[in-house]
Amino acid sequence: MAHQAHAYHMVDPSPWPLTGAIAALLLTSGTAVWFHFHSLTLLTLGNVLLLLTMYQWWRDIIREGTFQGHHTPPVQKGLRYGMILFITSEVFFFLGFFWAFYHASLAPTPELGGCWPPTGITTLDPFEVPLLNTAVLLASGVTVTWAHHSIMEGERKQTIQALTLTILLGFYFTFLQGMEYYEAPFTIADGVYGSTFFVATGFHGLHVIIGSTFLAVCLLRQVQYHFTSEHHFGFEAAAWYWHFVDVVWLFLYVSIYWWGS
């Protein structure tokens, strides 16, 4: 490897941004084809290409950061800023859904019956499955913090246990949310209540799945001795993301499930 006179990472040319963009194109167009023509071919192709891109791009980042030493302190600082800005953009993404919900619920139109929830909508009991989901996510926030402190203290076994528990809680949350959707007395087609409910909680559910996958990758890396007590930004980013998902759920629970019902 050539001598480098600075602490910054000059990234090598990579095909993965291009394959990722093609995968995104296939996913969006494939979803439209699925809706209109009931064909899953394009959507499946997009999913496969996306998974291959994710695997190979992450593999390259792990090589560069863990084995080649490119993730120096200044590079890690840049990655931290990047993750903070990404989470900030996600905050505004969800802010749009909350805005739509409160716009519809604080001044319900005559078409909705002048009340909220709209006439004819049977809401979910906030003190049943939604409350259990809240407890599950809060518990997962505790276990991911346990994992973080274990990494910093060099407690390898405890880190693996805590991460495994966090991932299991994440998948349990997804299962409960899926059952709730299946048994819900209204659909996404039931006016503004149905659309705001399913879009907001659905995108949150997608973020839980992404966060669980992120943590699963961290668990595999921890098992393979990739993290040290000083060098573990991959896990740190996953933990930040998971705490963000927790906080969004608390706002969803209070706004849509409890106040909105």
Curated annotation (Swiss-Prot):
Alphabetical keyword list: Membrane, Mitochondrion, Mitochondrion inner membrane, Translocase, Transmembrane, Transmembrane helix
Q: Where in the cell is it found?
A: Mitochondrion inner membrane
State the organism named in the record: Oncorhynchus masou (Cherry salmon)
* Catalytic reaction(s) noted: 4 Fe(II)-[cytochrome c] + O2 + 8 H(+)(in) = 4 Fe(III)-[cytochrome c] + 2 H2O + 4 H(+)(out)
User: Taking the first listed entry, what is the main subcellular location of this protein, grouped into a coarse class?
Assistant: mitochondrion
| Listed GO biological process terms | mitochondrial electron transport, cytochrome c to oxygen
Whether Membrane counts among this entry's keywords is: yes
Q: Which residues cross the membrane?
A: 16-34, 41-66, 73-105, 129-152, 156-183, 191-223, 233-256
Q: Which Gene3D superfamilies match?
A: 1.10.287.70, Cytochrome c oxidase, subunit III, four-helix bundle
Q: What is this protein called?
A: Cytochrome c oxidase subunit 3
This protein's membrane topology, according to the annotation, is: Multi-pass membrane protein
Instruction: Show the GO MF annotations.
Output: cytochrome-c oxidase activity
Q: Which residues lie on this side of the membrane: Mitochondrial matrix?
A: 1-15, 67-72, 153-155, 224-232
